[in-house]
Swiss-Prot record:
Catalytic activity, reaction form: pseudouridine(1915) in 23S rRNA + S-adenosyl-L-methionine = N(3)-methylpseudouridine(1915) in 23S rRNA + S-adenosyl-L-homocysteine + H(+)
Function: Specifically methylates the pseudouridine at position 1915 (m3Psi1915) in 23S rRNA.
Protein name: Ribosomal RNA large subunit methyltransferase H
Top-rank taxon: Bacteria
Source organism of the structure: Helicobacter pylori (strain Shi470)
EC number annotated for this UniProt entry: 2.1.1.177
Entry GO CC: cytoplasm
Record note on quaternary structure: Homodimer.
The family this protein is said to belong to: Belongs to the RNA methyltransferase RlmH family.
NCBIfam families: PRK00103.2-1 (NF000987)
Lineage: Bacteria, Pseudomonadati, Campylobacterota, Epsilonproteobacteria, Campylobacterales
Any Pfam family the entry gives: SPOUT_MTase
């Protein structure tokens, strides 16, 4: 299995994420983080919400894979507990997660993904990545009946 987290960000909270990356390997899952912040995104965010969203879509579109499970983290999307999250990931070999910038996703981009919300609360990119990585590890623990998830 391969899970890739793509985000509009300049850097990742590496130390804690590295722990989850290592733990996921025991389930034969490669957990990768890819931070994207093209030059046009910084400029677009200064101009308008619409241009910012378009720049996010342009950054992410090359990574949308019709053969993979594509999941966009979106605050108004479906949410559930860790068991529901594990069911969503089960039986998929390649899973791409997308975390937009401050202005969120364009509706057109969301049509190409399953949307999922981690919480009703708003998180910084750093916290969202940590929570997502932990939940990926927890989902794998549920799928493989590992005692981490009790």
């Amino acid at each position: 299995m391969r899970c890739v987290v793509y985000s509009i960000a300049k850097s990742s909270p590496l130390e804690l994420v590295k722990i989850y990356q290592k733990q996921c390997k025991q389930f034969d899952c490669e957990l990768e983080l890819v931070d994207l912040f093209p030059k046009n995104t910084a400029n677009a965010q200064k101009v308008s919400k619409e241009l910012a969203q378009k720049s996010y879509s342009l950054a992410f579109e090359p990574y949308l894979n019709p053969k993979a499970k594509n999941i966009a983290l979106h605050p108004k999307a479906q949410r559930g507990d860790s068991f529901a999250f594990s069911k969503m990931l089960e039986n998929h070999l390649n899973i791409n997660f997308f975390i937009a910038g401050a202005y969120g996703f364009e509706e057109n981009f969301l049509k190409d993904c399953q949307a999922w919300s981690l919480s009703e609360m708003t998180f910084s990119h750093e916290v969202a990545k940590i929570v997502l990585c932990e939940q990926i590890y927890r989902a794998l623990s549920i799928i493989f009946k590992h005692p981490y998830h009790k």
